[in-house]
């Protein structure tokens, strides 16, 4: 769940979370809870090319809420995102008896105050919802570590182009004959998603085997 202002920081956190989920075999669903801020179509376009489900919420009309309920049904779901993006507001709308505290966004910092301080699990719609505390940042080499050789697989839209690069072990950043970069240049991949991939790769590229977190 992500607030759609402060675009660059939010995009990195969103893409890191989704990449970690994909790497761990968990289905991420992108839910925009501030759909009235005018950037929904920008994100919708990026995620249509990513193959990840995208839901825009409009509280005035109820748009998107049924889709969220359907994803919860029969599953254990976690509401994740940085502070102030609307996790508690969405939970209160879906499940009024949850009575989660909410807060406004700081205009100076561009993020909200932590109102959820522990993980709480709620039974709802034939499934379960885990409401998690927010956070201010997410480092790729610490939170849900993904080795550099696996990172390309955490971005599903890269899939059709993997194995087509000129060089084995291509990092898809600067090499000649890179099929991923060619797809990006042709508009078949989202520039913002690609930028997130590069930022994550930069953080983990020099991590040695002995430095990697133990699974």
Model-found features: residue ranges?
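Polybasic, low-complexity association/targeting segments
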Residues: 80-81, 86, 114, 118-119
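Single conserved hydrophobic/aromatic residue that forms the stacking wall/gate
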Residues: 1-9, 13
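Canonical P-loop GTPase G-domain recognition
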Residues: 36-85
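Helix-rich effector regions associated with P-loop NTPase G domains
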Residues: 6, 19-28, 35, 50-53, ...
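Phosphate/Mg2+-binding loops and adjacent switch elements
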Residues: 16, 22-24, 40-42
